[in-house]
Amino acid sequence: MSQDSHSESKPGHAGDSAAHVLPIAAIVHADHAGTDRLLAKFVDGLRHAGLRIHGLVQERAANADKTSTMLVDQHSGQRYPLFQNLSSGSTSCCVDAGSIAAASVAMRRAVEARPDLCVANRFGGLEAQGGGLAAEMLNVAAAGIPLLTIVSNDYLRAWRAFTGDSGTELQPSIEAMYLWFAGLRARHARS
């Protein structure tokens, strides 16, 4: 993707004038350097502006190992551990599938609550295979609730297939998130 906060010419990128079928966007990144914190900062800004936010944000204490990573329910504040603490010799996936299943209730509640925005910590390997929070993400977007997530370049092709190229791809910046969200709200106000 270009460094411009708008887009490349591919449909579904921020800055396109075409109407999107789904009110869904992903912050696209090459590495995790601060992307979770950017999403959390954006969510905090919207919440302080009086908007209702649901979903999950990923949080990890500075200088902590990845087993300290939590999914934080943006409505209730409940925290779910994202990773299992496996032995150093283990070759199993350390993502805690049971914890993700428990955390998915935050996404399902969003469909009932109809918040201004729902966030999903990321579209990653599990979602690329149809697992993780994939079903919940589609249900939120299909209900017409704006959904924002994070996707690595590694899963960008799967993300595009998942959204049918109807999702918006954002640069990892607060400005890009605000522009996307403001555009959605403006289109909603006109309809």
Say what each PLM segment does.
Residues Q171-S191:
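A charged, well-structured terminal subsegment
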Residues N153-G167:
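Glycine-rich, charge-decorated loop segments at or immediately adjacent to ligand/cofactor-binding or catalytic sites
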Residues A128-L138:
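Short Gly/Thr/Asp-enriched flexible loops that form oxyanion-binding sites at enzyme active sites
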Residues M137-N153:
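Substrate-engagement module of ASCE P-loop NTPases
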